[in-house]
């Protein structure tokens, strides 16, 4: 079974399942391995959740028209692009020299109680400290690096599924 030959619905369902699996693993790591997510990790989770929603909506709707598939492909690509940006920022924070580190600041729950949403977003994206800690690695890559890999892969998958020319079932 070649997933590149699957229907749009099946391809978008696979994208949804990938996002759901990644979110489930993040929750497992938090609850069972005791790794608390930093604010940038939480924003990456939100981006994966938004991407999952677009993949699921596309899979459930399964538009027949090419324009509809392209819309879902672009929306998913945008969600993945936002996630890529957040993950890239997180990777940058992690690879900075130690002497450039500063505190990440208060927890996200405190920030959301004391600031407006745009201030929270700006504060989190300029934070460093705890966000710079690398507590988990797999094959030499940190979790934000793996998030970046997944965001890139899912962005390309969304574009492929959304823009793939599909043969009509009607023969001329």
UniProtKB/Swiss-Prot annotation:
The keyword Phosphoprotein does not apply. InterPro entries: DiS_bond_form_DsbB/BdbC (IPR003752), Disulphide_bond_form_DsbB (IPR022920), DsbB (IPR050183), DsbB-like_sf (IPR023380). Disulfide bonds join 38-41, 104-131. GO terms for molecular function: electron transfer activity; protein-disulfide reductase activity. This is Disulfide bond formation protein B. Residues 1-11, 64-70, 165-172 are cytoplasmic. Residues 29-46, 89-145 are periplasmic. It comes from the Bacteria. SUPFAM superfamilies: DsbB-like (SSF158442). One of its GO terms (cellular component) is plasma membrane. It is a multi-pass membrane protein. Its main location: membrane. Coiled coil: none annotated. It is found in: Cell inner membrane. Keywords: Cell inner membrane, Cell membrane, Chaperone, Disulfide bond, Electron transport, Membrane, Oxidoreductase, Redox-active center, Transmembrane, Transmembrane helix, Transport. Belongs to the DsbB family. GO terms for biological process: protein folding.
């Amino acid at each position: 079974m070649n997933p590149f030959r699957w229907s749009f619905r099946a391809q978008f369902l696979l994208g949804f399942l990938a996002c759901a699996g990644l979110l489930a693993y993040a929750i497992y790591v938090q609850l069972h391995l005791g790794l608390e997510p930093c604010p940038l990790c939480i924003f990456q989770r939100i981006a994966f959740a938004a991407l999952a929603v677009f993949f699921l909506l596309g899979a459930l709707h399964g538009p027949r028209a090419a324009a509809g598939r392209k819309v879902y492909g672009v929306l998913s690509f945008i969600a993945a692009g936002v996630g890529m940006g957040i993950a890239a920022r997180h990777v940058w924070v992690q690879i900075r020299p130690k002497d450039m580190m500063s505190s990440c600041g208060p927890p996200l729950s405190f920030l959301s109680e004391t600031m407006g949403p745009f201030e929270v977003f700006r504060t989190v994206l300029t934070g460093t400290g705890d966000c710079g800690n690398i507590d988990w690695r797999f094959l030499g890559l940190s979790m934000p690096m793996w998030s970046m890999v997944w965001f890139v892969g899912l962005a390309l998958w969304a574009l492929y599924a959304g823009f793939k020319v599909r043969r009509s079932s009607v023969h001329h």
